[in-house]
From Swiss-Prot:
Known EC number: 2.3.3.9
KW DNA repair (keyword) present: no
Family named by the database record: Belongs to the malate synthase family. GlcB subfamily.
Cofactor entry: Mg(2+)
Organism: Pseudomonas aeruginosa (strain ATCC 15692 / DSM 22644 / CIP 104116 / JCM 14847 / LMG 12228 / 1C / PRS 101 / PAO1)
Keyword Protease: no
TM annotation in the entry: none
Annotated positions binding Mg(2+): E432, D460
Gene3D superfamilies to which the protein is assigned, alphabetical: Malate synthase, domain 3, Malate synthase, domain III
Source species, domain of life: Bacteria
HAMAP family listed in its UniProt record: Malate_synth_G
Protein name: Malate synthase G
The gene coding this protein: glcB
């Protein structure tokens, strides 16, 4: 039983109450009485509104299900369907024109374009690595990944391989020639870098000296001007640093003594309380809030063991340089942090309201993450986050403008409780639910003075696409979904609406995750599509990926690209409403088996770690042993696709069970080296994780909007109770 403290009409878990009063509040200038009294009023006033919004979701879904059921066996009538969606208030009239009015936004969001990380804030090590991923070694990112081929004697090996190292150096020199070209000659032939008379001077192997074609790209240096340790350059708004140390192992092999190129990489990071964490009770929530507090105060630290030694990882300090005129230049040493709160769906028993009901978790997150961020606003931190006095909160899984307006109201109420100026709390709107996509302009308008981010999350969005049209028929296979008409229109619509509502210069227009952290050569080839599509940020799965994805923002001037895209014909809502139904379901038995096995394996690989270990985001080997980043969004697609095929008779429940059992053996094998792993086979009936996976598919049509959280939370609590955790 959870030990609770009565606070007014609220029953607060003691572990949360003690954390808030003893750790979070001191230093904020907010008294405990003021906070809890205000929190109770917010909960009492807004929890019923939250509940009503969820009822509206269910009501609309039931009407859509009924419409499709009444037309079973008939060809889909797109015109009648659209009229029906308008009639029931799902598709609303387009909002009148407006421009976003957000103020006090940090440059990383408003004026720069670059990679964005998303990490589970529940894991302090991941959180620190991401915070420090603002700057990343290009040499390490190239040497340690498949971007550099291992052919021709360039294997990674255990020690330093000079053949591979030379390929890395050649790649980096080519980057320098592209991003900071010389007036004459090439960085390939550089023999030294120095600063003379306020300019960068590059000596070449033919004995001549040259400078940058655009002298303004040189900003500053570290060390002695005649023999600098680092030279700071800027291109397309992003910084990078040529690091020089002729005595280092790599510098010894380089004609100019260059040991690395340090890239400005993850400009922003989302510290996630949502899809990448497994937090089901007060104890879990306090872990999340405590880590967020450490980030906001700048004192988060974690003991890390690597290569037989242990050290303490902390947040990096700012970077300090000397300008050409001798003055000091300081650059932000860390990624600018957002925090992603949970959406409107779930409740959490960390707090019970006056009637003994669990309080909506999104309201709790809004109150606690904002309270904690006051430490940064007050300067009660050794590692400043926002320089403009803002708190950046990503709000996921909102369905339509009413829900965006509710978030705006919640944030206003939280500001009042905490004594913050209006619109201090900024909002990032995840465009990952269909009703938000088709009404995106109205959603942005509902938070037009807070919006700092819109982002397409195609994974969740696909899950909602399947669930919304669950009764329409069998959908295409998962691999075919990306080439369906709706998805291209959805991605373009996000950019079109963002530009039309004046987000450029005020907010990020973002794109989704590269989910294969080991396949960096493919990422380097393909993910340039995101900046070309007009996104000034896109998600990457690791600091290394952030360093490599930064290269794309040197190849594409995103703000110029946005200006071009603003002139195109906007995406069509009719295209967005095109349901991804399979033209026929005459797949071969082998094709069906492969699809079921692939999804079953992905579901199990993720769910078993979620339920048994409380891991909400991990690299899960797929059926071909390719590591894929999985979180609840990928789980939503896989479970909804199988539920859809089950609903329409493409597969049977027996096939699902048989595949899950077979794939459980595969997942057990893939996790055999993990000493804390508990095998699912052969005791399937008594294995909580296996039963959770089965329930997600078999009961998939009945899950609210296809979300996986209700099953996962209940089953994780069951596992914790069963094992005394």
């Amino acid at each position: 039983m959870t030990e609770r403290v009565q606070v007014g009409g609220l029953q607060v878990a003691k572990v949360l109450f003690d954390f808030v009063n003893n750790e979070a509040i001191p230093g904020t200038g907010v008294s405990a009485d003021t906070f809890w009294t205000g929190a109770e009023a917010v909960i009492n006033d807004l929890a019923p509104k939250n509940k009503a919004l969820l009822a509206k979701r269910d009501e609309l879904q039931a009407k859509i299900d009924g419409w499709h059921q009444a037309r079973a066996g008939q060809a889909h009538d797109a015109v009648a369907y659209k009229a029906f969606l308008e009639e029931i208030g799902y598709l609303l009239p387009e909002a009148e024109d407006f421009q976003a009015g957000t103020q006090n936004v940090d440059d990383e969001i408003a004026r720069m374009a670059g990679p964005q990380l998303v990490v589970p804030v529940m894991n302090a090590r991941f959180a620190l690595n991401a915070s420090n991923a603002r700057w990343g070694s290009l040499y390490d990112a190239l040497y340690g990944t498949d971007v550099i081929s291992e052919e021709g004697g360039a294997e990674k090996g255990k020690g330093y391989n000079k053949v591979r190292g030379d390929k890395v150096i050649a790649f980096a020199r080519a980057f320098l020639d592209e991003a900071a070209p010389l007036e004459s000659g090439s960085h390939v032939d550089a023999t030294s870098y120095s600063v003379k008379n306020g300019a960068l001077v590059v000596a070449l192997k033919n004995g001549s000296e040259t400078g940058l074609k655009n002298a303004g790209q040189f900003l500053a240096f570290q060390g002695d001007a005649a023999k600098p340790q680092a030279v700071l350059l800027k291109h397309n708004g992003l910084h990078f640093e040529i690091q020089i140390d002729p005595s280092s192992p790599v510098g010894q092999t380089d004609a100019a003594g260059v040991k690395d190129v340090l890239m400005e990489a993850a400009l922003t990071t989302i510290m996630d309380c949502e899809d990448s964490v497994a937090a089901v009770d007060a104890d879990d929530k306090v872990v999340i809030y405590r880590n967020w507090l450490g980030l906001m105060k700048g004192d988060l630290a974690e003991e890390v063991s690597k290569g037989g030694s242990t050290f303490t990882r902390t947040m990096n300090p700012d970077r300090v340089y000397t300008r050409a005129d001798g003055s000091e230049l300081t650059l932000h040493g860390r990624s600018l942090l957002f925090v992603r709160n949970v959406g409107h769906l779930m409740t959490n028993d960390a707090i019970l309201d006056k009637d003994g009901n669990e309080v909506p978790e999104g309201i709790q997150d809004g109150l606690f993450t904002s309270l904690i961020a006051i430490h940064d606003l007050n300067g009660n931190t050794s590692r400043k986050n926002s320089r403009t006095g803002s708190v950046y909160i990503v709000k996921p899984k909102m369905h339509g403008p009413e829900e965006a307006a509710f978030t705006n109201e919640l944030f206003g109420r939280v500001e009042d409780v905490l004594g913050l100026p209006r619109n201090t709390l900024k909002v990032g709107i995840m465009d990952e639910e269909r009703r938000t996509t088709v009404n995106l302009k109205a959603c942005i308008k509902a938070a037009k003075d807070r919006v700092v981010f819109i982002n397409t999350g195609f994974l969740d969005r696909t899950g909602d696409e399947i669930h919304t049209s669950m009764e329409a028929g069998a959908v295409v296979r998962k691999g075919a979904m990306k080439s369906e008409k709706w998805i291209g229109a959805y991605e373009n619509n996000n950019v079109d609406v963002g530009l039309a509502t004046g987000l450029q210069g005020k907010a990020q227009i973002g794109k989704g995750m590269w989910a294969m952290p080991d396949l960096m050569a493919a990422m380097l080839e393909q993910k340039i599509g995101h900046p070309l599509a007009g996104a000034n940020t896109a998600w990457v799965p690791s600091p290394t990926a952030a360093t490599l994805h930064a290269l794309h923002y040197h190849k594409v001037d995103v703000f110029a690209r946005q200006a071009e895209l603003a002139k195109r014909t906007p995406a069509s809502v009719d295209d967005i409403l095109t349901i991804p139904l399979a033209p026929n379901t005459n797949w071969t038995a082998e094709e069906i088996k492969n699809e079921v096995d692939n999804n079953a394996q992905g579901i199990l690989g993720y769910v078993v770690r979620w339920i048994d270990q409380g891991v909400g985001c991990s690299k899960v080997p797929d059926i071909n042993d390719v590591g894929l980043m999985e979180d609840r969004a990928t789980l939503r697609i896989s479970s909804q696709l199988l539920a859809n095929w089950l609903r329409h008779g493409v597969i049977s429940q027996e096939q699902v069970v048989e595949s899950l059992k077979r794939m459980a053996v595969v997942v057990d094998r893939q996790n055999a080296s993990d000493p804390s792993y508990r095998p699912m086979a052969p005791n399937f009936d008594d294995n909580v994780a296996f039963q959770a996976a089965l329930e997600l598919v078999v009961e998939g049509t009945r899950q609210p909007n296809g979300y996986t959280e209700p099953v996962l939370h209940r089953r994780r609590r069951e596992f914790k109770a069963k094992n005394g955790l």
